[in-house]
Regions:
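Arg/Lys-rich, positively charged N-terminal/basic patches that mediate binding to nucleic acids
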Residues: 1-41
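Solvent-exposed, well-ordered amphipathic alpha-helical segments
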Residues: 1-6, 15, 37, 49, ...
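Residue-level signal for alpha-helical context at structural boundaries
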Residues: 29, 33-40, 52, 56, ...
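Short, basic alpha-helical nucleic acid-contact segments in DNA-binding proteins
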Residues: 41-47
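Basic/aromatic recognition patch in beta-strand/loop cores that engages polyanionic ligands
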Residues: 48-86
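Enriched for short, Lys/Arg-rich terminal
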Residues: 72-76, 80-111
Length: 111
């Protein structure tokens, strides 16, 4: 059975900005295709078949809940899993300083 998922406000904002940039840069067809790629990866996470990695090895802090990431297109989907659902914490471009951004996200996920 697939897990339900939800987005944090930060994840919603990041997805909106990605959609806007992709639309303005590459047009509506590519924006729609990239949105579908992201939705497909979210479905794969929900079904437990996404290739993911723990962020713990990139962090100097311990978190109560493991923060995971998976790659789609030019972005990383950062999320936390729970028994019945997962929460998309943020979407980061592959060129960001991943350990620094993950530390910030993980510190917020502690609460």
């Amino acid at each position: 059975m697939s897990k339900a998922w939800r987005l944090t406000p930060q994840a919603e904002q990041s997805l909106y900005e990605i959609a806007q940039w992709t639309f303005q840069t590459f047009g509506p067809r590519q924006a729609d295709a990239y949105e579908q790629d992201i939705l497909d990866r979210l479905d794969a996470i929900a079904d437990g078949i996404a290739h993911n990695r723990s962020c713990q090895s990139l962090l100097d802090i311990k978190t109560e809940r493991d923060v995971l990431y998976t790659h789609v297109g030019s972005h990383y989907l950062i999320y936390a899993e729970y028994d019945e659902h997962f929460v998309l914490l943020d979407v980061l471009h592959q060129r960001v300083d991943l350990p620094r951004r993950l530390a910030h996200i993980a510190s917020k996920a502690k609460s």
